[in-house]
Amino acid sequence: MAREECKALLDALNKTTACYHHLVLTVGGSADTQDLREELQKTRQKARELAVATGARLTVALRDRSLATEERAEFERLWVAFSGCLDLLEADMQRALALGATFPLHAPRRPLVRTGVTGGSSAVAARALSARSLRHEAESDFDVADLPQLEREVLQVGEMIDDMEMKVNVPRWTVQARQAAGAELLSGASAGASSAGGISVEERAGPCDPSKALAATVFSAVLLVAVALALCVAKLS
């Protein structure tokens, strides 16, 4: 039960960390907006909550000396995957901090990625104003105010990693995977190929179509008659 719970938490953390990673890649680009910065804040907070919950359960499980060998090995594999998620989260938070400081939203700036679209857009922007954009205008310093909080959270994640390594000593190089890297992809591809091959074999092994057999017979007879006529003409000449 504890292992399944840890797997579920780790799966949620993995997805949230991946989502945060993709969001960070757009900071400083032409699609960078206050909506994005708010989404980044919510996503990293969710990731930190999941990290705390996952780390607590894995720590309790791995410090249990009554665990069976196979059960401990499985928890150690989960621990290594969890450590990788935390490392990625910390690196992405540091990247978001650096990009957020370099590309503030409400300041003259050049976007990190340019779309090539130019021209006056003030009239279109005026028509596109909404309640949310007006609220953003009132909270124009959101991204600047969030940077100190993000910096503190980066330090907290680093401290969490150090604290975990002090509580549970699981060297990553001692944990063996149950299957080779990318085995899921290879197994899926082979399953698809085998199913396709099975279909083609069944199609080839099916009964012969009578109409096709009749057409082949007629064609063979016509061909034989043509060859016989050609031989007769050759002898007469």
From Swiss-Prot:
Q: Which residues form a coiled coil?
A: 30-54
Principal location listed in the UniProt entry? membrane
Q: What happens when the gene is disrupted?
A: Mice show light responses that recover at a abnormally slow rate.
Transmembrane segments annotated in the record for this chain: 213-233
- Subcellular location(s) per record: Membrane
Bilayer topology annotation: Single-pass type IV membrane protein
Q: Which GO terms describe its cellular component?
A: membrane; rod photoreceptor outer segment
Please list the residue ranges that the record places on the Cytoplasmic side of the membrane. 1-212
Question: Does Coiled coil show up as a keyword for this record?
Answer: yes
Can you supply a Gene Ontology BP term from the record?
Answer: negative regulation of signal transduction
Q: Which InterPro entries match?
A: RGS7BP/RGS9BP (IPR026512)
Q: Where is this region: SNARE-like?
A: 153-202
Cell membrane among the record's keywords? no
Q: What are the protein's UniProt keywords? A: Coiled coil, Membrane, Sensory transduction, Signal transduction inhibitor, Transmembrane, Transmembrane helix, Vision
Expression sites by tissue: Predominantly expressed in photoreceptors of the retina. Weakly expressed in other areas of the central nervous system.
Q: Which residues lie on this side of the membrane: Extracellular?
A: 234-237
Q: How does it assemble?
A: Specifically interacts with isoform RGS9-1 of RGS9. Interaction is decreased when RGS9-1 is phosphorylated at 'Ser-475'. Component of the RGS9-1-Gbeta5 complex composed of RGS9-1, Gbeta5 (GNB5) and RGS9BP.
Please give the function described in this protein's UniProt entry.
Answer: Regulator of G protein-coupled receptor (GPCR) signaling in phototransduction. Participates in the recovery phase of visual transduction via its interaction with RGS9-1 isoform. Acts as a membrane-anchor that mediates the targeting of RGS9-1 to the photoreceptor outer segment, where phototransduction takes place. Enhances the ability of RGS9-1 to stimulate G protein GTPase activity, allowing the visual signal to be terminated on the physiologically time scale. It also controls the proteolytic stability of RGS9-1, probably by protecting it from degradation.
Family membership noted in the UniProt record = Belongs to the RGS7BP/RGS9BP family.
Protein name, per record: Regulator of G-protein signaling 9-binding protein
Query: Mind giving the lineage of the organism this protein is from?
Result: Eukaryota, Metazoa, Chordata, Craniata, Vertebrata
